[in-house]
A protein has these predicted regions:
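N-terminal, intrinsically disordered charge-dense segments
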Residues: 28-34
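Charged alpha-helical initiation segments
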Residues: 40-111
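Short, hydrophobic, well-ordered secondary-structure elements
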Residues: 107-133
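Short, positively charged low-complexity motifs
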Residues: 2, 15-18
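Short non-catalytic regulatory patches outside canonical folded cores
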Residues: 125-221, 246
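Charge-enriched, short contiguous segments at helix-coil
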Residues: 198-284
Length: 284
């Protein structure tokens, strides 16, 4: 029986990727087989690597586009990380698109996309609010304080007498007062950050969602006075770690795949709105 060189077979299939539906259909299985083989032997041959890279890179923006998209981020380390995350999200999408991902691969695609985009949204909003531009505003400062209840300090002699008066239904009523204390910045939730960004005029509605036929997530929780765009960002962040292994059920995968596509489509309006607000406030 003649042995088939999987690397040669993969190379020939990859060269036909864009023109043959049959090669495209079987490419996922071929590349997975190649991956197992090459993990034992060596990396993909240069011809295969170059073809895959060319496919993944051909529709992606150049470096200048990414630099301009995050030009408001003055922290060079954070900026590099955000750009890298965005590039990786798009590159991985192209990989899975080329594989015509299904089942486990599709679930992997969705989980990676959601995690990456949610991380970009969160890190960017946090930076704009707390690190660079609006940290001194009352709206942001309110996020860093919280109301707490503290019991009154009552002398022991008086406390015993008071306890007799403050005993009801088998329980002791503890007198306390309400005060403000500093809140740990790590405890500020993403939805609170989005609401603050909306109140500051950083995040607004997007025109395409004014149409009754607009592509809006069906299960977002509308917040009074806030546009669907903000609610979508909150929903995207909520589900980033909620895609469980049982999500291979088709309707779950379809939902999260749609969500990951919306996450990508919302990234540009998100960045544009931040830049517009910063320009309007004379901060850029």
């Amino acid at each position: 029986m003649e042995l088939v060189d999987m690397r040669d077979l993969g190379s020939r299939a990859v060269m036909r990727w864009g023109s043959s539906p049959h090669a495209r259909t079987n490419l996922s299985r071929l590349l997975l087989s190649l991956l197992l083989l090459e993990m034992i032997v060596m990396p993909f041959e240069k011809e295969i690597r170059d073809t895959i890279l060319a496919y993944c890179m051909r529709d992606l923006p150049n470096d200048i586009w990414y630099e301009n998209s995050f030009d408001f981020v003055k922290d060079s380390s954070l900026k590099a990380r955000l750009i890298s995350e965005f590039k990786n999200a798009r590159f991985m999408y192209k990989i899975f698109e080329g594989l015509a991902a299904e089942d486990e691969l599709l679930l992997a695609e969705v989980k990676m996309q959601m995690l990456m985009y949610a991380s970009i949204f969160e890190a960017t909003i946090h930076y704009v609010l707390f690190d660079q531009y609006y940290k001194s505003t009352p709206i942001v400062q309110n996020l860093l304080t919280q109301k707490v209840h503290k019991p009154f300090s009552i002398p022991t002699g008086q406390l015993s007498a008071i306890n007799k008066l403050l005993f009801h239904d088998g329980k002791t009523i503890i007198p306390y007062f309400e005060t403000l204390q500093k809140r740990d910045i790590t405890k500020v939730r993403f939805d609170e950050k989005c609401i603050a960004a909306f109140q500051l005029g950083i995040l607004t509605g997007i025109p395409e969602q004014n149409d009754s036929t607009a592509d809006i997530l069906p299960d977002i929780k509308q917040i009074a006075g806030m546009p669907p765009f903000c609610a979508e960002l909150i929903r995207i962040y909520e589900v980033r770690n909620a895609i469980h292994l049982h999500a291979e059920l088709k309707k779950e995968i379809d939902y999260h795949l749609a969500l990951s596509k919306i996450a990508y489509r919302r990234m540009q309006p998100f960045l544009n709105q931040i830049r517009t607000k910063l320009n309007a406030d004379g901060l850029l």
